[in-house]
Amino acid sequence: MMSTNFHWPTTNKNDNREVSIETPTSTDPHVPRDSLASMPHATASTTIKKRKRDDELDGDKSTTTTTTTTTVSSSSTRKYLQSSLGSSKFKKAKTPKISGQPLPLPRLIESLDRSNLQKLVQGLIAVHPELQSTLIKISPRPSIQDSIQLLQDKFDMIISHLPYKCDVESDYSYLRIKPHLQEFLSSVSDFILNYLPPLETNMTRSLQFLHEATKLVYNLPNFTNQEFQYTKSTALEQIANCWLIVLSQDEEKDGNTDVVKVIHELELLEKLHEHNEISFNKFEKVVDYCKDKLEQHELIMNNNEAGSGVPSSISDLITVDYSKYSIANTTSI
């Protein structure tokens, strides 16, 4: 039977103290396992304590190593981030700087509504008055529909400011809407002048606008205030004169058949009778003028139909042999 050098601990009969030798937990290759058993008690205890210290030192070393590794890793990460930041800064330096800037003028004008655009143009004229004539030249002329719509809006503004709990025709009502009334009448005057000859050469356009503007004026509330009555009467008289100016613009032309054609096409005689009745005969001269033109035209047409063989113009009625009045014939007489 093979024997080993390892011996189990025994109890000495002469010594009552027990010596317990613990098996070392460390497996140090430099210390044989059997030599530990044969060591004396003090030496073994010292060795065991030393082993424990070594184990603790090994643990501290591993912790230190881990901490060092973590520190190194953190340092490496920090260096990587710094290098990344440095590279990103380098890239930003190459990228052109983008900063905010105002809208271009065409985009700015596109974004403005009617009210703000009007304020912009008026402010521009206030700063640079010399631009007024240029703006008038380059701006397009408003259409009849747009012109009438603007006057209608100003008329509606008057109606909307009338008091609810008061007589509409009272002085209080008139004083309340007076600023809006003045603005309305001023606009009517400006637009009428815009549709008069020689600026407006189309008689039909001028008369169409005058008809709509006349209706708006006499549809105003009939305030009892004397100032309003005088203002309204004067305005209607001036509008009636403008009708005469438009109708007589081609009076110098031979025949002047355009006005008769327009009177028939627009049914002006019926409309003027209505205006004259509502305005208390303010349009009587205009009605008489239209009647006179229609009568003259009818007389000419009747004469042409009666004498179909007669020339239609005065120059054709007169035929003169000018050879009798030559210088040679005169001297021979």
From Swiss-Prot:
Its main location: cytoplasm. InterPro entries: Cut8/Sts1_fam (IPR013868), Cut8/Sts1_sf (IPR038422). Signal peptide: none annotated. The keyword Cytoplasm applies. Residues 1-13 have a biased composition (Polar residues). Residues 1-76 are annotated as: Disordered. It is found in: Cytoplasm; Nucleus. Residues 62-76 have a biased composition (Low complexity). GO terms for cellular component: cytoplasm; nuclear membrane. GO terms for biological process: nuclear protein quality control by the ubiquitin-proteasome system; proteasome localization; protein transport. Keywords: Cytoplasm, Nucleus, Protein transport, Transport. GO terms for molecular function: proteasome binding. The keyword Transport applies. Binds the proteasome. Belongs to the cut8/STS1 family. Involved in ubiquitin-mediated protein degradation. Regulatory factor in the ubiquitin/proteasome pathway that controls the turnover of proteasome substrates. Targets proteasomes to the nucleus and facilitates the degradation of nuclear proteins. This is Tethering factor for nuclear proteasome STS1. The lineage of its organism: Eukaryota, Fungi, Dikarya, Ascomycota, Saccharomycotina.
